[in-house]
Structure formats: C-alpha cells, structure tokens
Curated annotation (Swiss-Prot):
This is Cyclin-T1.1. The gene is cit-1.1. The keyword Protein biosynthesis does not apply. Residues 336-354 have a biased composition (Basic and acidic residues). GO terms for molecular function: cyclin-dependent protein serine/threonine kinase activator activity. It comes from Caenorhabditis elegans.
Amino acid sequence: MSVSSRGAASPAHRTAPTKWLFTKEEMKKTASIQEGMSREEELASRQMAAAFIQEMIDGLNNVKDPKMKIGHTGLCVAHTHMHRFYYLHSFKKYDYRDVGAACVFLAGKSQECPRKLSHVISVWRERKDRKQLTTETARNEAAQIIVLLESMILQTIAFDLNVHLPHIYVLDIMKKVDKKEHYRPLTSCAYYFATDVIAVTDWSLRYSAASMSIVIIHLMAAYANVRIERLFADFINEDSPWYAKFDETMTNEKLREMEVDFLVTYRNSCQFHHASKFNFREHRPMLENPDVRKLDRTRDARSHSPMVHHVPDSTVNVRPRAYVPRDELTVERLNKERGVEEERRKRERDRMAGKLDSSTSSEKRARIDPLANNFVSSSSSSNGKLAPPPIPPQLNFPPPPIVSSGYNHKNQINRKNHENNHTNSSVSPAFVPSARTFDVAPMLTPPTAPKLQSADNSDMDLEDGELE
C-alpha cells in the first residue's frame, strides 16, 4: 500500500485498504447470516443501527458551543465502525443500540470531538429505554457496558481507526471538474448523499471510497438532469471513460451494478435518508397559516442532551420531554382520558352503593353547623339576625339625571352604532368599554362630594358599647 507524502491525516491520494473490503460471496458469510438471518434482515438491522447512531449524535449535539458538537465525519466513522463490527459479530447476540452508543463514543475520540462518558450514557439510555438513570449504581453499570463494548469494537477492528470516507473524494473530484463552482448545489447534495450511502447500505465493506464517490456523482448528475459528458468534458477521451482518472478499478458493469443495487435499497429505506432531511431543513418553505399547537410542540421537542438543564419534566412519567414520537403522544393522551373515565365510573359506583352523599344542595345546607348562620351574606334576610348595615345617605348617590334638551336629543349616542364601531375596530376587546355604560345619557352634572363630619361631631371619643 503506497502512502502519500501529504501525511497520514490526508487520505485523498492513498490506496484504500483491502482488509475491510469483501466480495459478494464473503458478504454471504457474515455472523448474522450464519446464525439464520437473511440478507434483507441483516441489512434492515444495519439501517436501524445507523439511524440510532444518528439519533444519538443529534442528542449529543444539542449544545450551544459548536466546538463540542460531533461533526459529520464523526457520524460516518461511527457508521463504518458499526458495519465492521457486525461483519464478525451477530445482531442476535449484541443489541445494535448498545453497539451504536459505543461506536459514537469511539468515533468521538478518533475524530477529535470527544464527549464525556456520562453524556453518552445519559443520551443512550434515554434513546433506548426512554428513561434516565437516577442512581449512582445504575450509572456505573451503564458506563461499564459502554467501555466493555468499546474495547470489543477496538479488538474486532484490530485498532484500525483509519477510515476512508467517500466525502473527501466527492469534494476532490468536483473541485477538479467545477473550478468556477457552477455546480455548487450539486456538490452539496452529493456530499450529504454520501452519508446515505454509508448509512443504508453495506458498501463500506464491499467497495472503496473512490468507487462510491464515482457512483454518487453519477447518480446526483442524473438526478439534477446534468449530462455527465458535459460535466466531465475535460476528462473524457476515446480510449478511457470519464471515471478512469479517478478510480482505476471502476468499469461500466460495476457502475451499472452499483447503481441498480443502491436504487433498490434506497427505495426501500426512505425513512433513513439523511440527505433529504438536510435539504428539507435547509430549504423548508414558509408556512402561510402556521398551527400554533404544532409550533409549540416542535419548540418543546428538545433533545435529551445532558448539557441542557432547562428542559421541563413530564408530568406523566417524570422524565424530560425531549423528542417524543407521535405514537407516544397519542398513548399518553389516551391513558390520561382513560384515567379520567375510570375516576368518573368509580364515583358513580360509590354513589350507587351509598358510599357517597347523594343529597341535594338544600339538604346539605340544612345540616350545616348553626354557627354558620352568624356570617353575613348578600342573600341573607334580617329575620331577627344580623343584617348588613344600610348604606349611608351621603354615599347613596341618586342616578344621573336624564337630560331631554334638544341638543342632547339630537346628539344622543347611538348604542348600536357604538357596538358596530367597536366590533369592526382593530382594538383588542380587553380594552373596549362595555356597552352598558351607554344605557343612560351621559351625566352632565358631576355628583356632589360627601360632606365630612367635623372634628367636634366625631364619634371617635365614644367608649366601647356606647351609642351616639
């Protein structure tokens, strides 16, 4: 294997290692297939493991500091570690969610974006079991599981952390072809399309990164309706095709086989597409009539990152809300409605059995303690009992006089017009005065102020129990 003079950190011009590239016959001898799984079942398990890795990284990246986020390269490296591990180990023996968490922890170290083990454990248990670890013993046991699986992955891949990704080759080829950046959207789409190739297929175990980049660019050119002869006009000769200078192992038969294989796989795994989700997130159309309930639900659907401390706890199962699927929201709503209905039926059964008091309000009022009659209420009568004192005459103002002059009659306020004006106006109803104010004509003469008693006639000097 020839090594470029550019250094070990730049895999752009190096031959891809053949240790982790297997033929079609060798791919039929994986550990899962030997234990009874079919080829389709194994591929579906790989796709679910890749989706779980993506979900875990989304949870860990819910931080404000961009330096603490796991990059796109770390995601693809974690996918590659998972594919290599499950070539020699079976899905029936190792849970893909546990292995996916260990791959994320290992990829963060190898790609210089490490995350704390406690953070990885917190997001892993929340994504796996929808609950948090509350005791120190449970945290230690979970940490031992992740560390043990990490050591198993390292032993399985023989400590080979050098992963070749097709993303670098895609950018390198498009940089040589599109020097003026006329096809920049095509390059961006092909870059994220390469992530789908690693996530939904097992090509990282069958083809080199250079071969995958050729197929990705060819498919993206066909998708964007760009002729490949025009795109690679400077690299096409009569003796060699357009891809000869970028990958010596590529042939027309191999290109056709890879394209058909990918289209069939990609069509059956539309829920795991990373490129389409990225494009929808970046180019999301504006909502004409947004639903406030959906916006609030999306705003509250925050990730379960341990760095986020302001996420409120759920009142149902005492855990942070985080990302709750639609099915789980429906189950919570139905459980709440069922609890309310069971409580209503229980009260009805107790009432029929005589356990609850079914008497009327008047009967209950008759059994109230007699001392309660000493309290003054607005509806109580003065049948020898305490009654509220009468209103002083100086505070009992008469109603305002109704002026019947010609001027006021002509200019009297119309109540209906006033209501229509306030209804059609844009002022908030909370600040609109009530129409009852205009049941009578406006008062022209202000009421006279009450006369205050002089200091000589004041009853402040009376003793307790004395009357005036």
